[in-house]
Amino acid sequence: MQKKILLALIALTFAFAPATAERIKHEDKIIEAITLMDEGKYVPSIRILRDVLATDSTNYHARYELGYAYYLAGNYRQSAAMYEQLVDYPEANDQTFSMLGNALDMAGDRKRALDVYYDGIKRFPNSGKLHVELGTMALIDGDSKTAMACYLRAVKVAPDYTPGFYRTAMLLFNSDRPELALCYGEMFLAKESENKSRIEAVSKGIVDTYRSIDSPS
């Protein structure tokens, strides 16, 4: 889904730019690189995106996709270097900060990753994505209380962002609040229609929770 949205954004960006042969060529090249990434062909994708940037060094979408290609290829430092340049672009959004934080975290720099997520929230306070990122970092550190607070914040500020409901429900399934787990689980299922693995996980959690409630103590 995110790739579909990005392709639409690329098309819109170029649609409002002056129509030139070079612009059209860049658009085609970026889409070609994305297709290669989806096929797991990171090296040729990186080569194409670097060629675009060689003639258009400020192209946000080319640089973003190059960072993503590096990330998928496991070159997290190079990925972070790309996204560090992008957070100051006018086109930057919460996904830009999310990817920078993720790349830094995967590179082993958790402190900087946390700082990036917080910086992103200052700029995009209604980003469910960034609140979920913070919650997941807290959960990995064993702080389920902070994780829950972050997930609930994500649900509050971004009610259409389904990962907030998913993370909240999954955490509650392992708590002593089964009624809340069922509530957030049902809300997630009502909102999510594409992520089959998460739908299956939440559905199982709901069934197991009902069984535990019905079972004699």
Predicted regions and their residues:
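Helix-start (N-cap) detector for alpha-helical repeat units in TPR-like alpha-solenoids
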Residues: 25-27, 60-61, 93-95, 128-129, ...
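Register position in tetratricopeptide repeats
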Residues: 38-39, 72-73, 106-109, 140-141, ...
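Structural marker of alpha-solenoid helical repeat scaffolds
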Residues: 55, 89-90, 123-124, 157, ...
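Canonical tetratricopeptide repeat
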Residues: 65-68, 82, 98-99, 133, ...
